[in-house]
């Protein structure tokens, strides 16, 4: 149930799609780590890319497969979906680019990032691209310090309202933030409102780890990746402390 609400909530977010289309042009086939419901996967396939998506969440994989089954343009011919762990996958194939959109990379511990990079570079061709987007590390650090030092959680902030895909009841989406020992926990609260006044809440939580641009780049270098671009948004602006995102583009050169 929660997965369907998450998919509906994020389906309208498309600001990053031109970026992924542009940077993967000529870098087929693409491997997407954490493909989820296919928010990025399907548009890339529609743009003519050959793409493989990995995800551990079975419900998300099933949703994506159902979307492909209903598609009238034979997108399934350009998309392979695998239910597996992005840290330990074994694929007998080489890719021109590997991407990890949707801020997923910042949810990994340092040990997990090491495993992912070591595994990923085994299937990335020489001069292939690895692209990861994360929330601005300066913002994560400042927010963590504020919440941690004051021992507080943020108040839920109403983000949007949409119609439940199955019941047609309104769903209020709120978010709240809390400091953990090594990061920020981001809770999404999905409140389904019933006509009789009842409310049913679903919770989706993600934790973003404290890290820095410098550490990310050091990890890239150790994995045989040269950082070729450091961007602050999906329109290509340079990264600085006020950027909404940190987007790292690495080129395999070892």
What does each of the following model-derived ranges do?
Residues 1-28:
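Conserved class I S-adenosyl-L-methionine
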Residues 34-36:
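Class I SAM-dependent methyltransferase "Motif I" SAM/SAH-binding loop
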Residues 45-88:
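Class I SAM-dependent methyltransferase SAM/SAH-binding core
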Residues 87-97:
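A short acidic, Gly/Pro-enriched loop at the edge of an enzyme's catalytic core
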Residues 114-126:
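A short glycine-rich, Lys/Arg-flanked "PGG" loop and its adjoining helix->strand segment in the class I
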Residues 132-214:
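SAM-dependent methyltransferase
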Residues 207-254:
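C-terminal lobe and adjacent flexible extensions of AdoMet/dcAdoMet transferase-like proteins
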């Amino acid at each position: 149930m929660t997965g369907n609400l998450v998919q509906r909530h994020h389906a309208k977010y498309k600001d990053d799609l031109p970026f992924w289309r542009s940077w993967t042009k000529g870098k087929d086939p693409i491997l997407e780590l954490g493909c989820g419901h296919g928010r990025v996967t399907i548009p890339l396939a529609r743009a003519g890319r050959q793409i493989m998506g990995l995800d551990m969440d079975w419900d998300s994989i099933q949703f994506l497969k159902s979307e492909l089954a209903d598609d009238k343009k034979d997108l399934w011919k350009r998309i392979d979906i695998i239910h597996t762990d992005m840290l330990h996958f074994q694929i007998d194939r080489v890719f021109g680019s590997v991407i990890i959109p949707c801020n997923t990379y910042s949810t990994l511990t340092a040990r997990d990032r090491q495993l992912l990079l070591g595994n990923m570079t085994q299937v990335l061709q020489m001069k292939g691209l690895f692209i990861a987007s994360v929330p601005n590390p300066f913002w994560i650090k400042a927010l963590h310090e504020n919440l941690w030092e004051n021992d507080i959680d943020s108040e839920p902030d109403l983000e949007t309202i949409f119609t439940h895909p199955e019941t047609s009841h309104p769903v209020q989406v709120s978010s709240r933030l809390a400091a953990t020992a090594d990061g920020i926990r981001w809770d999404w609260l999905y409140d389904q409102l019933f006509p009789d006044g009842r409310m049913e809440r679903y919770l989706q939580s993600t934790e973003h780890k404290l890290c820095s641009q410098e550490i990310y780049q050091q990890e890239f270098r150790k994995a045989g990746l040269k950082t070729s671009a450091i961007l602050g948004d999906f329109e290509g602006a340079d990264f600085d402390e006020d950027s909404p995102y940190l987007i790292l583009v690495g080129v395999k050169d070892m």
